[in-house]
Amino acid sequence: RAAELAPVPYTQPTTDAVVALREHATQTQTQVRKDVTRYRYGQEAHLDETLERLGLSPNDTQRPVLSGLHEEQRDGAYTLVLEFDSPFIEFDKWQEKQPKIEAFFGPGITAEVSQEADKKVAVAMKAVVA
């Protein structure tokens, strides 16, 4: 039996206004949101391959864990925020990878990394409003 990976929980409710903005989300934002909020099979962790490609996963035990997500409106744009527990990867490493994160999840988004709490990092992907 393949490993079962539970959906990542929303950490705050999505408002109707933000739901309305989903139509402006990029294909990648929509795909990431749908992938991490459903059961997955045969995967070690949510976004494990992505974190590896971004150089943020030295090994399985030190890989950051996607612990939650939420959707919001930033500057009038749809924004998907991924929340990671990152006890082994320092925040400055996340900041250093920000351009790579933006390129990986782009085009059509800007990426912002922020430290939410000790060892917690948020990656906000904001859709570029044309």
Model regions and ranges:
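Cytosol-/stroma-facing membrane-proximal "stalk/adaptor" domains immediately downstream
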Residues: S67-A130
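N-terminal topogenic membrane-targeting module
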Residues: R1-H70
